[in-house]
């Protein structure tokens, strides 16, 4: 995957032979400087393509760790490569002025069903471009995010559990163990 993407993104932490391990890091720091597009923007846009957002800013601040699992087949890896290449083109559209620096598919990602189905659509791109940026998404399907953006850093520092009290999980539970010998 890193070889397929090397002309589109800076790949960090290559070995002496120019190879990467089973995961690789896309360095978005230069893109961030020139366009304002962040690693979070790219991660959120991947959700519009139907992919789980990758690890952000670890081990490289401003990077994305792409770590496909062994259970992914070649077709799925190829779709992710295509998604990342299409996202790179969306970034180029910002670089060239074809897309606005603040009101674009990356800055507004992910696109929730609620937003897509709203009567109000004040974006310079179509709902189709937002929700189905690649043709194969119609066939493959995807899970739409239910929440667009949150303040991730605030949430990380101010975690509040909204779970029921632990005692709610133990009501009606018989903790005796019966063993037949």
Where are the regions that the model predicts?
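Non-catalytic terminal extensions of PLP-dependent enzymes
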Residues: 2-181
């Amino acid at each position: 995957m890193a070889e397929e993407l090397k002309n589109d993104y800076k790949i960090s932490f290559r070995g002496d032979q120019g190879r990467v391990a089973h995961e690789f890091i896309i360095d978005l720091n230069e893109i961030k400087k020139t366009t304002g597009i962040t690693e979070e923007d790219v991660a959120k846009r991947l959700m519009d393509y139907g992919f789980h957002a990758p690890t952000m800013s670890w081990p490289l601040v401003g990077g994305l760790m792409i770590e496909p699992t062994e259970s992914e087949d070649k077709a799925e890896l190829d779709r992710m490569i295509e998604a990342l290449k299409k996202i790179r083109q969306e970034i180029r559209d910002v670089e060239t002025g074809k897309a606005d620096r603040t009101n674009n598919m990356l800055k507004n990602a992910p696109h929730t069903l609620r937003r897509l189905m709203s009567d109000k659509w004040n974006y310079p791109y179509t709902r189709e471009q937002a929700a189905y940026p690649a043709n194969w998404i119609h066939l493959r399907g995807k899970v739409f995010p239910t929440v667009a953006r949150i303040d991730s850093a605030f949430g990380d520092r101010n975690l509040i559990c909204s779970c029921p009290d632990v005692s709610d999980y133990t009501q009606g539970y018989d903790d005796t163990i019966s063993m037949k010998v």
